């Protein structure tokens, strides 16, 4: 048995004699600090780093059988919108192999495993996955804060928009292991509603 930790590594200190700004957000305190994942083995007491590098890495979900981690990585791209890109990876804790699910995805937010571990549910704007969730007139740009649901089959990586024709803005979502249904809250004007998706 083990625990998965999110840990933080402090970035290189700024030289007070040099005005060094990597990007605009570097002016914010703590911007150079990076997050990474580690596994703590309860039997041996050994803490094993799972990720490292320049970009922030975070845990999205753990599969129901505790074999896989759904890992996210964020990085900046300031030359065009969106300025933040998110990648998704599936890490097999049995052999430590990593499978890339999405590389430098645009307009993505979060992701979670299905109860059977064969799919992932991803949240993002209508422009995610090359705009398959867009439901506006040609030439119009959909709102970046209009959160949609997408279902990715892990066998073939095909993605299906689940809420393309659903008007309310998805807020929080959970895929129930009890009944296999997806439950989510969504914002409709000034009201918040709870929905079930099967």
Show the residue positions of the predicted features:
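Hydrophobic, helix-prone linear segments
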Residues: 37-41, 88-92, 113
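Short loop/turn segments that connect beta-strands within beta-propeller blades
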Residues: 41-45, 92-96, 153-157, 197-198
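A broadly tuned preference for mixed-charge, low-complexity surface segments
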Residues: 1, 44-47, 95-118, 159, ...
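A flexible loop/linker signature enriched in serine peptidases of the S9 family
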Residues: 6-36, 51-57, 72-88, 100-109, ...
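Residue-level detector of Asp-centered blade-edge/turn motifs that repeat once per structural unit
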Residues: 64-65, 115-116, 177-178
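Hydrophobic beta-strand positions that form the internal "hydrophobic ladder"
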Residues: 3, 69, 117-120, 182-183
């Amino acid at each position: 048995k083990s625990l998965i930790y999110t840990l933080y590594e402090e970035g290189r200190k700024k030289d007070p004699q040099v005005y060094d700004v990597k990007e605009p957000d570097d002016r914010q305190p703590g911007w150079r600090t990076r997050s990474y994942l580690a596994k703590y083995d309860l039997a041996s007491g050994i803490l094993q780093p799972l990720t490292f590098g320049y970009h922030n890495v975070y845990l999205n979900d753990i599969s129901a059988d505790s074999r896989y981690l759904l890992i996210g990585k964020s990085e900046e791209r300031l030359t065009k919108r969106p300025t933040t890109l998110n990648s998704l990876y599936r890490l097999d804790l049995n052999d430590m192999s990593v499978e890339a699910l999405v590389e430098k995805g645009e307009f993505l937010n979060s992701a979670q495993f299905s109860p059977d571990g064969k799919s992932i549910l991803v949240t993002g704007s209508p422009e995610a996955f090359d705009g398959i969730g867009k439901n506006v007139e040609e030439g119009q740009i959909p709102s970046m804060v209009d959160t949609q649901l997408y279902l990715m089959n892990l066998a073939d990586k095909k993605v299906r928009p689940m809420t393309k024709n659903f008007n309310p803005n998805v807020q929080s979502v959970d895929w129930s292991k009890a009944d296999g249904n997806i439950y989510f809250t969504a914002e409709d004007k000034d009201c918040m509603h709870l929905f079930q998706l099967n």
